[in-house]
Amino acid sequence: MKPYLIGIAGPSCAGKSYLSTHLARHLNAAMLNLDSYYADLNHLSLAERAHFNFDAPEALDSCLLIEHVRQLSRGDAIEKPIYDFKNHSRTGQTERLEARSFILIEGLFALYWEEIRAVQATKVFVDLGEEICLARRIERDTRERGRTRESVLEQFQTTVRPMAQRYVHPTRQYADVVLTGDGEIDDELKLVLNHIKVGSSRGSGT
């Protein structure tokens, strides 16, 4: 049986990863995070990397991402790149990801590319108010990615907000399930699992 692919998209810090972690645990699913596919910026200085627009689809290596998603959809394993967020570059190492019966594709642009949507049997959009997303992003990036509060605020105002409005929020139209990122996780899981149950009974894919 072909793997059942689930796309989980939404604005930064809306709760995509939290939902994905719980869903992956419930389904024993493989999880592919789009953050691993940011383009390698080793050719740029550290100052240039710091001002790079990471919030547009062009920031990702979409060719590699699409190829890897297609491989996983066929049941093949991939060598996923490892990205260093402190230096804004790839480490040069990879992590092997084996296909499983269920595969989660999670990230800002999980519903953006038609080629990826075409192999997703369930598409989820997680939405949340901008102020809460910003507060979560400040907390995450200062703790996990070595950023200052000021740099996070500047990035949010210059690229995160406008790019979300241009590229992320419009992909909500493709979602089978729309969730709020501050809802009860058990309730949100139930909504997604119900759609997966229906989709699985019809066969994976679209």
What are these regions (language model features)?
Residues 5-7:
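Short hydrophobic/aromatic beta-strand immediately N-terminal to the Walker A/P-loop
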Residues 12:
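The conserved Walker
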Residues 16:
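Conserved lysine of the Walker
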Residues 19, 23:
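Hydrophobic positions on the alpha1 helix immediately C-terminal to the Walker A/P-loop
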Residues 25-33:
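Post-Walker A helix-loop "phosphate-sensing" segment adjacent to the P-loop in P-loop NTPases
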Residues 30-31, 39, 43-87:
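Conserved nucleotide-sensing/catalytic segment adjacent to the nucleotide-binding pocket
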Residues 91-144:
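ATP-dependent NMP and nucleoside kinases share a basic, alpha-helical "lid"
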Residues 98-99, 139-142, 161-206:
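NTP-dependent small-molecule kinase module
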